[in-house]
Amino acid sequence: MMKKIRVWEGRKGWKHNKYTKSLTSTGEQIGFWSDGHPAFHNRGTAFWVYRTKKGEIIIHKVHWSKWTTEDDEGAFFKFANLDEAATKFHRVLQNARVI
């Protein structure tokens, strides 16, 4: 099901000037993987994998800080297709069961 995707990049907290940029697109989430416990905002890195309406792959990476949500840091990576995304994020895509 296609819906609006909005991902952000930068640091969240007041001392880090909020988020530096964001990306909005139409698409669907095709995978998720985390190496920690991001739901509790205490540690780890989470990856959301999206496919846009145009077929592009967006990987949204969020590193959750150990102590405060003000230090959470996000980044997004946009690729033309799944093969291109796999060159940089092969392990993430495997663990998210996308490839």
Q: Could you describe each region identified by the protein language model?
A:
Residues 3-5, 49, 57-59:
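Terminal, low-complexity, charged helical segments
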Residues 16, 37, 41, 60-63, ...:
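Histidine (H) residue identity feature
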Residues 17-18, 42-47, 72:
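Short, surface-exposed coil-to-beta transition loops
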Residues 26-56:
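Amphipathic, interaction-prone secondary-structure segments
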Residues 63-99:
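Mixed-charge, Lys/Arg-enriched low-complexity segments
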Residues 2-38:
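Negatively charged, low-complexity tracts enriched in Asp/Glu with abundant Ser/Thr
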Residues 11-12, 34, 51-55, 61-67:
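Short, flexible beta-strand-to-coil junctions
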